[in-house]
């Protein structure tokens, strides 16, 4: 496949994959100064477009929305999103020629046509920004030489960009400057100010590259962030019901359980999440996680290989050209699963109960996080970037499941993420279904270890040491020290 990444030499590919630097808070001391009094035009007003714009306006910036003429005339949802929040709205021709910063926040599938439409209207020496580098890296789009091209990529769905900002926090963010388009050397300063305006500096900002962002983002969302949560939801629900758990209770345990379980992950990593289990349950979750890792590792490696080579992007773009046949088929299959169609009980479930009766879910999270992290690092992605794409974003995705199950998760993630999630889930379920069904009923929906709380001390010590010594735990402990304003999701 011919694209920007594949046009690079191997040395340059590795260099860009390995670009990742955690930025210190004092690097954002200028706050939004370089963007003050600048005309900022966001193209598209979906989940990312609206919520980033709301944060930036609250940070004192001048935000307008450029939409297709048809979207304005027909008063489509993007027009409603912008006008109902009192933003100035206009066509490409009306707003983009005046813009100092143009931010393309349309769906990935539309980027090529959108850039073709707006680039002639972008004034000389302006700045163009993306929140995902797919169009540059995978499609190979070339931008006019006088235009500075940057990326500010919040590592979560757009809805959570806003929710975390309103909590007084933010979401981890990757920023980058396209090396082919920084004619005046201003890209990094503009990207820093933009990240500050969305609140990203409070959660941690990585100076990355377009290549590293795209390859790690695709891997994280396909495997742990969306794929494992979808596969785990469907298989765990089916197992619980087969084992006699009341379906409405099972639905609630899963729908809200991911959010609760990964809240512990967010604040203290895998170690803290596993520590919420009883000692017997911890040992059993460890055994299940190790077995899941062994069974799923080849699939994780295939996804990473296909992402690096461009095979994944080629397949997805073929589906785009085929009117999203695969995506729509998989979406319909997901909507018709028993988990999606079963209403959650109104019965209260206490926080600790989600852990006590969710040993299998904890094991899925541990296996998915560690596998995604390990596979990305093996491919040359720096540990800090792999951490954000495997562990830290997981509770933010889990929060979307808590709202409206898998439907909500797949609705608010990007179109590339949704396709990748279904692709992974379609292959993962047959890999682990029989193993999951063979597990004892106590690992899902019933409290584990009620007969005996005794464990082998040496075995417990060994498991605890293994958990704490995993590289994702070490890098996570370091990065979380910067997240001093981190807020609870689960209340």
Curated annotation (Swiss-Prot):
SUPFAM superfamilies: 6-phosphogluconate dehydrogenase C-terminal domain-like (SSF48179), NAD(P)-binding Rossmann-fold domains (SSF51735)
PROSITE patterns noted in UniProt: KARI_C, KARI_N
Keyword NADP: yes
Keywords: Amino-acid biosynthesis, Branched-chain amino acid biosynthesis, Magnesium, Metal-binding, NADP, Oxidoreductase, Repeat
Catalytic activity, as annotated: (2R)-2,3-dihydroxy-3-methylbutanoate + NADP(+) = (2S)-2-acetolactate + NADPH + H(+); (2R,3R)-2,3-dihydroxy-3-methylpentanoate + NADP(+) = (S)-2-ethyl-2-hydroxy-3-oxobutanoate + NADPH + H(+)
Residues that hold Mg(2+) 1 according to the record: 217, 221
Binding sites annotated in the UniProt record for NADP(+): 45-48, 68, 76, 78, 108-110, 158
Keyword Repeat annotated: yes
Cofactor annotation remark: Binds 2 magnesium ions per subunit.
Domain KARI C-terminal knotted: 209-353, 354-486
Gene Ontology cellular-component annotations: cytosol
Domain KARI N-terminal Rossmann: 15-208
GO terms under biological process: isoleucine biosynthetic process; L-valine biosynthetic process
EC number: 1.1.1.86
Pathway given in the UniProt record: Amino-acid biosynthesis; L-isoleucine biosynthesis; L-isoleucine from 2-oxobutanoate: step 2/4; Amino-acid biosynthesis; L-valine biosynthesis; L-valine from pyruvate: step 2/4
Entry's Gene Ontology molecular function annotations: ketol-acid reductoisomerase activity; magnesium ion binding
Active-site feature positions: 132
UniProt binding sites for Mg(2+) 2: 217, 389, 393
Binding site for substrate: 414
Function of the protein: Involved in the biosynthesis of branched-chain amino acids (BCAA). Catalyzes an alkyl-migration followed by a ketol-acid reduction of (S)-2-acetolactate (S2AL) to yield (R)-2,3-dihydroxy-isovalerate. In the isomerase reaction, S2AL is rearranged via a Mg-dependent methyl migration to produce 3-hydroxy-3-methyl-2-ketobutyrate (HMKB). In the reductase reaction, this 2-ketoacid undergoes a metal-dependent reduction by NADPH to yield (R)-2,3-dihydroxy-isovalerate.
HAMAP family registered for this protein in UniProt: IlvC
Family, similarity comment: Belongs to the ketol-acid reductoisomerase family.
Protein name (Swiss-Prot/TrEMBL): Ketol-acid reductoisomerase (NADP(+))
Organism: Christiangramia forsetii (strain DSM 17595 / CGMCC 1.15422 / KT0803) (Gramella forsetii)
Gene: ilvC
């Amino acid at each position: 496949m011919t694209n920007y990444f594949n046009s690079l030499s191997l040395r340059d590919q590795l260099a860009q994959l390995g670009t990742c630097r955690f930025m210190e808070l004092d690097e954002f001391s200028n706050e939004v100064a370089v963007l003050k009094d600048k005309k900022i035009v966001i193209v598209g007003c979906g989940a990312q477009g609206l919520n980033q714009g709301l944060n930036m306006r609250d940070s004192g910036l001048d935000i307008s929305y450029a939409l297709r003429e048809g979207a304005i005339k027909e008063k489509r949802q993007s027009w409603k999103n912008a006008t109902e929040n009192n933003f100035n709205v206009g066509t490409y021709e009306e707003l983009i020629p005046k813009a100092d910063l143009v931010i393309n926040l349309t769906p990935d599938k539309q980027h090529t046509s959108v850039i073709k439409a707006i680039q002639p209207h972008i004034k000389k020496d302006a700045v163009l920004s993306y929140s995902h580098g797919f169009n540059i890296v995978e499609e190979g789009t070339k931008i006019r030489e006088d235009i500075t091209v940057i990326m500010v990529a919040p590592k979560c769905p757009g809805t959570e960009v806003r929710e975390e900002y309103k909590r007084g926090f933010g979401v981890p963010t990757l920023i980058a400057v396209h090396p082919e388009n920084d004619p005046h050397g201003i890209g990094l300063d503009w990207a820093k100010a933009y990240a500050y305006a969305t609140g990203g500096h409070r959660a941690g900002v990585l100076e990355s590259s377009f290549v590293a962002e795209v390859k790690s983002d695709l891997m994280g969302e396909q495997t742990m962030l969306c794929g494992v949560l979808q596969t785990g939801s469907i298989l765990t629900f089916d197992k619980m019901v087969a084992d006699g758990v009341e379906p409405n209770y099972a639905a609630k345990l899963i729908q809200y359980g991911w959010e609760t379980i990964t809240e512990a992950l967010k604040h203290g990593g895998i170690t803290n999440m596993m520590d919420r289990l009883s000692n017997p349950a911890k040992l059993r979750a460890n055994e299940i996680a190790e077995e899941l890792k062994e069974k799923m590792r080849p699939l994780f490696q295939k996804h990473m290989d296909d992402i690096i080579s461009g095979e994944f992007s080629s397949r997805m773009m073929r589906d785009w050209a085929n009117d999203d046949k695969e995506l729509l088929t998989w979406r319909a299959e997901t909507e018709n699963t028993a988990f999606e169609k079963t209403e959650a009980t109104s019965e209260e479930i206490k926080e600790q109960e989600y852990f006590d009766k969710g040993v299998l879910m904890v094991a899925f999270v541990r296996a998915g996080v560690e596998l995604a992290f390990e596979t990305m690092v093996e491919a040359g992605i720096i540990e800090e970037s792999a951490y954000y794409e495997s562990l830290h974003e997981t509770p933010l995705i889990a929060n979307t499941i808590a709202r409206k199950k898998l439907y909500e998760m797949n609705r608010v993630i990007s179109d590339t993420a949704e396709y990748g999630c279904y692709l992974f889930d379609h292959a993962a379920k047959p890999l682990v279904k029989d193993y999951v069904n063979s597990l004892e009923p106590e690992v899902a929906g019933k409290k584990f270890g009620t007969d005996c709380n005794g464990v082998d001390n040496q075995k417990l010590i060994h498991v605890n040491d293994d958990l704490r010594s995993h590289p994702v735990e070490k890098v996570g402990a370091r990065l979380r020290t910067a997240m001093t304003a981190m807020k609870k999701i689960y209340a």
